[in-house]
């Protein structure tokens, strides 16, 4: 197995009030040789073995990117749109497109206000709306595949994905105190 790639980052103060920061990771994550063991219900308990070569490592997207737009309209107030893209990921090491988590893009909205006082050094009020567009996507899961002969005696492969959905639009408020 091997992993190789490159990561690029950009931070820019566009104006006094507007900042952009982003990054992208491009990678190749490969398994040179992989043996898939699959339950065979015709000879259960028994297994079939399928050999794979040069496949993608599971849960290792080839592309991950973020782009954040921060606006500072007045002193101590920050408003931001935070965007994250994650490329396609496989549930196992077979690189089978039917055993994958689709790529996704999510956008969050954040407001951050800071107050300075004599008693408390810093009071930070935060409000975040996660998944602003209510995108339906998965972030994790697993696959179960088995083989069994059909009514004609032909061996068939059956595969099921079990995916963990991400939260729909939700929010968080926070208060941080520094003494």
Model-predicted regions and their roles:
Residues 1-93:
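Gram-negative outer-membrane beta-barrel transporters
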Residues 2-4, 59-63, 103-107, 167-171:
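Residues that define the transmembrane beta-barrel architecture of outer-membrane proteins
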Residues 15-21, 25, 99-111, 128-131, ...:
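Conserved long hydrophobic alpha-helices within structured protein cores
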Residues 37, 96, 141-143:
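Short, glycine/charged-enriched secondary-structure capping and boundary segments
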Residues 52-56, 96-100, 160-162:
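Outer-membrane beta-barrel domain signature
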Residues 65-71, 105-112:
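Feature captures outer-membrane beta-barrel proteins of Gram-negative bacteria and organelles
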Residues 87-90, 114-179:
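C-terminal beta-signal and adjacent terminal beta-strands/loops
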């Amino acid at each position: 197995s091997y992993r190789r790639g490159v990561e690029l980052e950009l931070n820019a103060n566009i104006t006094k009030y507007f900042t952009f920061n982003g990054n992208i990771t491009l990678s190749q994550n490969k398994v040179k040789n992989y043996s898939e063991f699959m339950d065979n219900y015709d000879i259960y308990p028994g297994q079939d073995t399928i050999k794979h070569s040069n496949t993608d490592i599971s849960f290792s997207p080839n592309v991950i990117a973020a782009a954040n737009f921060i606006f500072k309209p007045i002193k101590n107030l920050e408003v931001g749109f935070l965007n994250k893209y994650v490329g396609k990921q496989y549930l196992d090491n077979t690189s089978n497109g039917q055993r994958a988590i689709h790529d996704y893009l999510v956008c969050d909205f954040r407001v951050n206000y800071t107050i300075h006082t004599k008693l408390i050094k810093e009071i930070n009020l935060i409000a975040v709306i996660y998944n602003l567009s209510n995108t339906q996507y998965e972030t994790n899961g697993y696959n179960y595949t088995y083989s069994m002969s059909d009514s004609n005696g032909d061996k068939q492969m059956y595969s099921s994905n079990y995916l963990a959905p991400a939260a729909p639009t939700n929010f968080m408020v926070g208060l941080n105190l520094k003494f």
